[in-house]
Amino acid sequence: MSGLLVMPRILRCLNVSRISAILLRSCFLYGTFFGVITFRIERKDSQLVAINRRGYLWICLVIRLLASCFYGYSYDAWSGQYEDMYLRAFFGFRLIGCLICSVIILVMQFWFGEELINLVNRFLQLFRRMQSLTNSPKNRFGDRAEFLLMFSKVFSLLFVFMAFRLMLSPWFLLTLVCDLYTSVGTGMITHLCFVGYLSIGVLYRDLNNYVDCQLRAQLRSLNGENNSFRNNPQPTRQAISNLDKCLYLYDEIHQVSRSFQQLFDLPLFLSLAQSLLAMSMVSYHAILRRQYSFNLWGLVIKLLIDVVLLTMSVHSAVNGSRLIRRLSFENFYVTDSQSYHQKLELFLGRLQHQELRVFPLGLFEVSNELTLFFLSAMVTYLVFLVQYGMQSQQI
């Protein structure tokens, strides 16, 4: 009983926002180590700024090209041990998917490197403006929900090292390192999309909370203070100024989310397809060959967790954009101020057309329904494999 009473105190004392920021930093270092993130974050004039590193970019280019070439060259060596053509076809599709994602990473780093740097700086600027508007503490990211998602993501990133078995053969070690470097780079696309949409969701939630609590109280005061406006004009000016700031932030979040979607639309689709293919391949290999090892099924669970975390981050961002409509109508108060009405009409008109929806290549919507469809498809596929394996043994 005493433990149940102590647990809430521990959660209150635990600054989950700061821990989430530390976990986000660890994910950044993880992506930097595997050559996907080639910029650095520096503090200039008490502000965080993303700066490109051309030297490290070329180093990552050489390493990724060598790893991809050796990974493709060694395909015949390690896939020839399997006689099942279906399984070899799976390995071939995985090879093609990893190489395509590697090419996309190189294209984004070299041809869209400046756009990525500008996008990261716009994210950092939005968080600075949000912190200034809401007077929130520095070095924080989200709340308990974001902490749980970030903790699950870090666990998923670390689990990939447990799925590989080390052997003393130099050829096998070289093949393993190239496979790890290439496959982790492919998965980093999903991780970057997760962090991006989670950041958009945090921005929407913080701004919506500010509009719902503080800005609403300021706008309501316009009704009561409208008659005494001439005697005390400062509250009205402050409310209108904060309304302008909220308008700017909502519009900027929408523009940043659109730029993010345009950059990661195709990579996200290929990464999701690669995850589905990898799960089906590993499940087929484990069930039909009766290799129920922790490494194989743990890898399937890891890939499934990545997809679930991605859909949850997208869901938080989409819900934040949809909540704007209710908040905008709730903050519409009738006054005699014409400028106030013009700003609120602008507020209402813009936000009705800024709902966020994630459609990779326009083929499907990333949502919780996609997760349910994904789970049902996996269960059906696993049942089919079990039945197929049982019938094959009887024959």
UniProtKB/Swiss-Prot annotation:
Residues 1-18, 111-153, 205-267, 315-369 are cytoplasmic. Belongs to the insect chemoreceptor superfamily. Gustatory receptor (GR) family. Gr93a subfamily. The keyword Cell membrane applies. Disulfide bonds: none annotated. The chain crosses the membrane at residues 19-39, 90-110, 154-174, 184-204, 268-288, 294-314, 370-390. In larvae, is expressed in neurons of the terminal external chemosensory organ and of the dorsal pharyngeal sense organ. It is a multi-pass membrane protein. It comes from the Eukaryota. It is found in: Cell membrane. One of its GO terms (cellular component) is plasma membrane. The keyword Cell cycle does not apply. This is Putative gustatory receptor 93b. Pfam families: 7tm_7. One of its GO terms (biological process) is male courtship behavior. The gene is Gr93b. Residues 40-89, 175-183, 289-293, 391-395 are extracellular. One of its GO terms (molecular function) is taste receptor activity. Probable gustatory receptor which mediates acceptance or avoidance behavior, depending on its substrates. Keywords: Cell membrane, Membrane, Receptor, Transducer, Transmembrane, Transmembrane helix. Its main location: membrane.
